[in-house]
């Protein structure tokens, strides 16, 4: 797995994760699995097609140009849940084409973890990923085989199925299969990162809310209800009044930021005008 260290790419990921959460809102498990598969598929397409990859990640072009290109090429290939996520991704500013691919893969993994979370199985997935990382890391030959980027992806996926099929959660199996298909470094390290990603999702139960004016009780209840629907768990609100926002709300849940403030919209407009 690849960690996004550039600030622009982290901001792009945060914006696209918000779109992902909206896409999964009210979705059945099979729909979320399909969404994840399609995001993995787009990442694979960009990995193969260098010209397309560069065009969709070119921050010097107008975001609308990148959006039109993505819609023209992918609208017939993607479902109604995946397409808006991909569009948001290509409209965003990534530091490199590699980060765009890594971001799409991260979003696909997050979708699968959301599925496990809503089924009440996120704890189990986290534990399985952690234990598999330790098991594979302790077997030198297996680690070498699964981490080798020159080894057949299909062959490695078959090995994974033989090892864990029927023994772990379906989400766990899907995550491991995808990880070994395109390993970036040691698979055991990738599994540890996935376990950490799972743990972060479990910890996202507090929303830090900044508003230009105090929220009424009714507004607080409505916001808490909306966030609970998005995150599939009760969300406690930590409220702060910040007149500099000008209006609207700025909500942070874990690493995810929902910026509906006037100041945020103006800043976004300035970035678009500068592109």
From Swiss-Prot:
Q: Main localisation, per the record?
A: membrane
Lineage: superkingdom = Bacteria
* GO annotation, cellular component aspect: plasma membrane; proton-transporting ATP synthase complex
Named from the GO MF annotations, one term is: proton-transporting ATP synthase activity, rotational mechanism
The protein's topology relative to the membrane is: Peripheral membrane protein
**Protein location:** Cell membrane
Write the record's keywords in alphabetical order, separated by commas: ATP synthesis, Cell membrane, CF(1), Hydrogen ion transport, Ion transport, Membrane, Transport
What NCBIfam families does the entry give?
ATP_synt_delta, PRK13430.1
Q: What exactly does this protein do?
A: F(1)F(0) ATP synthase produces ATP from ADP in the presence of a proton or sodium gradient. F-type ATPases consist of two structural domains, F(1) containing the extramembraneous catalytic core and F(0) containing the membrane proton channel, linked together by a central stalk and a peripheral stalk. During catalysis, ATP synthesis in the catalytic domain of F(1) is coupled via a rotary mechanism of the central stalk subunits to proton translocation.
State the oligomer form and interacting partners: F-type ATPases have 2 components, F(1) - the catalytic core - and F(0) - the membrane proton channel. F(1) has five subunits: alpha(3), beta(3), gamma(1), delta(1), epsilon(1). F(0) has three main subunits: a(1), b(2) and c(10-14). The alpha and beta chains form an alternating ring which encloses part of the gamma chain. F(1) is attached to F(0) by a central stalk formed by the gamma and epsilon chains, while a peripheral stalk is formed by the delta and b chains.
The family this protein is said to belong to: Belongs to the ATPase delta chain family.
Q: Which PANTHER family match?
A: ATP SYNTHASE DELTA CHAIN
Name the UniProt record assigns to this protein = ATP synthase subunit delta
Name its species.
Saccharopolyspora erythraea (strain ATCC 11635 / DSM 40517 / JCM 4748 / NBRC 13426 / NCIMB 8594 / NRRL 2338)
């Amino acid at each position: 797995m690849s960690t996004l260290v550039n600030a622009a790419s982290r901001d792009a990921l945060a914006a696209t994760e918000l779109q992902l959460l909206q896409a999964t809102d009210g979705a059945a498990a099979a729909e979320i699995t399909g969404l994840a598969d399609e995001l993995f598929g787009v990442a694979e397409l960009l990995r193969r097609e260098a010209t397309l990859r560069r065009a969709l990640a070119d921050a010097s072009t107008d975001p609308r140009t990148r959006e039109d290109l993505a819609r023209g090429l992918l609208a017939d290939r993607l479902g109604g849940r995946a397409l808006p996520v991909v569009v948001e991704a290509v409209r965003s500013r990534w530091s490199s084409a590699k980060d765009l691919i890594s971001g799409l893969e991260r979003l696909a993994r997050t979708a699968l973890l959301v599925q496990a979370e809503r089924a009440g199985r996120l704890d189990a997935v986290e534990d399985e990923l952690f234990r598999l990382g330790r098991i594979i890391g302790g077997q030198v030959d297996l680690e070498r085989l699964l981490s080798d980027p020159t080894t057949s992806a299909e062959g490695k996926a078959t090995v994974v199925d033989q090892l864990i099929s029927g023994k772990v959660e379906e989400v766990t199996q899907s995550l491991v299969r995808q990880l070994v298909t395109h390993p970036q470094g040691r698979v055991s390290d990738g599994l540890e990162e996935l376990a950490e990603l799972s743990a972060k999702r479990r910890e996202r139960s507090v929303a830090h809310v900044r508003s230009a004016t105090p929220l009424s009780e009714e507004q607080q209840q409505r916001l808490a209800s909306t966030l609970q629907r998005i995150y599939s768990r009760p969300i406690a609100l930590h409220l702060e009044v910040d007149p500099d926002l000008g209006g609207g709300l700025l909500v942070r849940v874990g690493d995810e930021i929902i910026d509906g403030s006037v100041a945020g919209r103006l800043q976004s407009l300035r970035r678009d005008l500068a592109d």
